[in-house]
Amino acid sequence: IATLFAYIGIIVGWQKLGLSFNFLYLSSGGLTVLIAVLCLFFFPHFRTETQPKTKLVIRRRYCLYYALEFLSGARRQIFVVFAAFMMVEKFGFEVHQLTALFLINLVINIFVAPLFGYFIAHFGERRALLIEYSGLICVFLAYGGIYIFDWGVVLAATLFVLDHLFFGLRIALKTYFQKISSPEDIAPTAAVALTINHIAAIFLPVLFGLLWLVSPAIVFMAAAFLA
C-alpha cells in the first residue's frame, strides 16, 4: 500500500508540483531513517523455538540454490537497470511516465501474486521456475529486437510489464529453499544468498554498461543467455 501511494504521489507530484530528484531522495531518505528509529524502539522482539546460527553457512547441498540466486540477481539487474534505461534512452520516458509503468506492475502483481502462490503449491517449484525463465528469455530477446527491428513504444511497455510479471514467480525459489534447508540454516544461508545476489548487482551493471556502449541489443541477448 505504501508503495502504491508513493508511485501515485510521484506521478501526480512530478507534473503538478514540479518535484525534483533532490526533494524525492532527501524526503524518502529522511522518512526511511525515521521509520528505522521507530522500529528500533517500538518493534517487538520475537523468540523462536529454533535458535538460528549467527555465522554464515555455506553447504554443498545448497549449491544449486546459490547458483539460482546469482542468476536471479543478474536477471533482476536487467529489468531494474537496462530495461528502465531503454525506456528513457530510446523512447524518452520521463520520471512520471516510467513510474506509471511501475504502478501498473504493482497493481497487476497485487492480483496475480496469489495465483502464482496457488500454482507453485499445486504444480511445484520446478514448473514455476521453468515458466519464469522461459518467459524471461522471450522478453529479453524481444528487448533486443526493439533495437534491431526498431519496434515501437507500445511493445516495449508491454514487455516491461511482462518482465516484472514473470519475476513474480521468483517466490518459487524461496519455497524451494525452505524445503531443502534445515530450520537453523535458514537465516545464515539466506544471508549468503543475499550476498551472492548482490554480487551480480554490483558487477553486472558495470560489465553490461560497457557492453551497452557497443550495442544495447547484445546486452539483452546476453541477458537471455543468463535466463
Task: List PLM regions with ranges.
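Transmembrane alpha-helix termini and helix-breaking/packing motifs in multi-pass membrane transporters
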Residues: 2-25, 85, 89, 203-220
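C-terminal membrane-cytosol helix-exit motif in multi-pass small-molecule transporters
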Residues: 10, 29-48
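Helix-to-loop junctions at the C-terminal end of transmembrane segments
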Residues: 14, 112-125, 212
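Short amphipathic helix-loop junctions that connect adjacent transmembrane helices
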Residues: 81-98
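Cytoplasmic membrane-interface "Motif A"-like loop-to-helix N-cap segments
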Residues: 122-134
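C-terminal ends and interior cores of transmembrane alpha-helices
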Residues: 135-149
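Hydrophobic core of transmembrane alpha-helices in multi-pass small-molecule transporters
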Residues: 153-168
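Intracellular juxtamembrane helix-capping segments at the cytosolic ends
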Residues: 168-181
